[in-house]
Structures are given as structure tokens and as C-alpha cells.
Amino acid sequence: MYRVHKLLSMIGYCSRRSAERLIESGQVTINSKIVTPGDKWFVGDELKINGVKIDLSLLNKQEIEIIKYHKRLGEVVSRDDPFNSNTVFNSLPDIEGRWISIGRLDKNSSGLLLFTNNGELANKMMHPSSAIEREYIVETDQMISKDNLSLLCEGVPINNGLVGKFNKIINISKNTYSIILSTGKNREIRNSLKYIKHKTQ
């Protein structure tokens, strides 16, 4: 017995958050009944997404895999981007199940990413409670003042009520900085720097 959103992430179909969105939009059924948040799957139940039966034979048999991949500039970390087919998933090796990204980088960034076939592991590593630090090397259009360096570590508003907060920011050389985060908000670094009227190069 598993909650459906957890089950879908366990078998590597998608992340737990994506599974929740599928359920909320009515795309998931168990035994022809639309699943609602919190519903559970029992052994023998027929699980479908958009009318397509999900193969659950790998449940509890699938070995956890993790790979590292260097994302290039211009690539997107998405399977469903109608505007850009240059997705990192086209470059990953074939496996049973699906690769799930552990965090992401935007189109205009490059760097190391981790991928796994286990949604629960991905969810655990991405969750703020895990406090896993990520390092970003960023070049800005101008040097950041000491006051603004302190402000970025205290936290600044970015968008939709969210706060961008750096664990550390260290000047490496001239306008280049090492930024340490333990959260993964969308465009957090770019929007935080924008708040202090700086741009990334």
C-alpha cells in the first residue's frame, strides 16, 4: 500500500511534486476511478495516467541509480518544453523507468547536475530539510559592495513573496563569486542579484 504520489516517484515516473500536479488535474485513475490527493494504491490495483496503464512490475525490484551530467549552455532541464527541444534528457543513457533531475539549472547556466531513477531519493535530496549545499560560480556586471554581500546572506525579496538567501558568497576574483545555497528556488541567484541592481554575465 502506497499513497499514489509517493508510488509514482518511487518507480521513477516523475517527482513527487509532479505526481501531485497530475493527481490534482484529474489525470490519474485507480481501477477507473479518478484519484484524489491522499488516495492509496494497493497491490492488484490498476493505475493509469491519461488512460495509459502504468507498469508497476519494477516496484521494489529497481536498483537505485545516480549519474552526474554536465549541463551545457542552451540546454533545458525539462522533458516538455514546447519552445526548445534541446533537453538534457536526450543526452542521458537509456534505463528502465525514467531519469529524474536532482535540482536544475536554467537555460542560460551550465554546470554539474545529478540524476536518479528514484523519485523518493530525488525528493529527499531537493527538500530544504536535507540542507544539501550547492555551489554556483557567478560572474557579475560589477563588483558587489560589502553591504550588499551581507544583505544577500540576510535575505532579499525575489518574487511571489519568496526570499532569496545565500548561505555564503565569496569573491573569487574581480567580478566572479562563489555562491553557496541550500535551497533551489527558480532563478534565485539572478533575481537576488537583480534586487541589488546587479546582473549575471
Where are these regions (language model features)?
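Basic, flexible Lys/Arg- and Gly-enriched helix-loop patches that mediate nucleic-acid binding at interfaces
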Residues: 1-201
